[in-house]
Amino acid sequence: MEKTKSKTKCLKILLLVIAIIVCIFIAIVTRRTIILSEIDKKVTELENNSNNFYMKTTFIDEKNYTASIERYIKDDVSKLVMEKTTPDGKNAKITEITYPEKRKMFTEVNGVKVMHEYNEKTAIRGAHIEKQTESSYTTISNPAYSMSKRELIVNAIVTSIKTKKIDGKDYYILSSKMNTNFLYNTNTTKMTIYVEKDTGLTTKIVEKVNENGEIKEIYKDFEYKFNNVTYEDISEPDNSEYKMQENS
């Protein structure tokens, strides 16, 4: 009889411990889900409602290559400027300007300049577009983007979220190696993303990669400016300096 009571008591304690663990897990996942949802909402509002902004991303990869991507948005024109420099000083530059009905690309590699022009209806810019019938693209980094509630909850489970004050601003620090929305390299072991709490904007990404058994880091820094892009900023390079290449 005493043994039965003892077993019953142990079982109740075990069930209580399991219930507490489950409650803690649910509370943690709920908090993460709310935070990711808030970030997604803020970035989506910026993406869909901002028609004049500048964004720059600077990369330093595990092989010490440096690259920068600048994006200029003004009205219905998007200009993308990508530059990459190797450790030995070689430089490549691509400028792509997207209009509603055409796209022009200017490449410059080792001093050779080539221009391509594509006469085609281009994708529209926007996130979470309801009743979408055309292809779309986004420009602002959104580590919390999700296509469904299920995806949001799964990412909340596999993503650690901490808060930290940096230079007087509050940040969310998102870390994961399984988040379906993070853009990993094939040898990535972990990615950490710094998100400004007030705006939802990503300001820094640190990606740890396994390079032949050695853990190295890739850094991406983000800079944003709103409502200061001019028509000169989105202008084309001098076409006369480029050789026109026919597109097949």
Predicted regions and their residues:
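An acidic-aromatic
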Residues: 70-140, 217
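Beta-turn initiation residues at beta-strand->coil junctions
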Residues: 58-62, 82-87, 106-111, 178, ...
